């Protein structure tokens, strides 16, 4: 069945003429972090792909609109970020359908072509449902574990140690709904934000281009 293969990197022969790395951001939009991420991407004139949680898109539609208007990809990361392996088929289908609707409601002009399972945990039900909606399932090939707040240098070093042409880099702009201490939300992703410029500059110094997913 179409789109049942999970994408963890982009075939360099099928991609752009120049070697590319693909930055992706999960769990947003986040009113404290997403605007600053977008500012940094704009400063460097690069595009990325944002895997947004539908519940967050409902609360922050303006950020979804900004993501799209500034030329980035917006993608499905389910409605409430559950572990799909613990969900029934109807629950899986509802999570994916409702997230798509929330994104389109927030930004009617959005083109949703990709989906990423929360925690990277795919199920047959999720893959079949994604295929029925024409969504390509995306994993990642580079994970600096920025969600664990290991330090800016660690995030940068882990990306640079693993990145190569076609790599899909996993970063985060928020966390699962309700998972973080509310008092820490304003600074939750400060390390990720601080790392982005260094990552972009270093990848470019290697002759790599940063783009949103094709």
UniProtKB/Swiss-Prot annotation:
| Disulphide-bonded residues | none
Q: Where is the NodB homology domain?
A: 19-211
Q: Which UniProt keywords apply?
A: Cytoplasm, Hydrolase, Metal-binding, Nodulation
Q: Which GO terms describe its molecular function?
A: hydrolase activity, acting on carbon-nitrogen (but not peptide) bonds; metal ion binding
Gene3D superfamilies xrefs: Glycoside hydrolase/deacetylase
The family line of this record is: Belongs to the polysaccharide deacetylase family.
Query: Which SUPFAM superfamilies is this protein grouped with?
Result: Glycoside hydrolase/deacetylase
Where does the UniProt annotation locate this protein? Answer: Cytoplasm
* One Pfam family linked to the record: Polysacc_deac_1
User: One biological-process term from Gene Ontology?
Assistant: carbohydrate metabolic process
> Where is the site described as Raises pKa of active site His found in this chain?
146
Classification via InterPro entries:
Glyco_hydro/deAcase_b/a-brl (IPR011330), NODB_dom (IPR002509), Nodulat_NodB (IPR026402), Polysacc_deacetylase_ArnD (IPR050248)
Give the protein's recorded name.
Answer: Chitooligosaccharide deacetylase
Q: List positions binding a divalent metal cation.
A: 77, 81
Instruction: Give the EC number.
Output: 3.5.1.-
Catalytic residues identified in the record: 26 (proton acceptor), 172 (proton donor)
Give the originating organism.
Neorhizobium galegae (Rhizobium galegae)
Record flagged with keyword Hydrolase: yes
State any GO CC term.
Answer: membrane
Q: What does this protein do?
A: Is involved in generating a small heat-stable compound (Nod), an acylated oligomer of N-acetylglucosamine, that stimulates mitosis in various plant protoplasts.
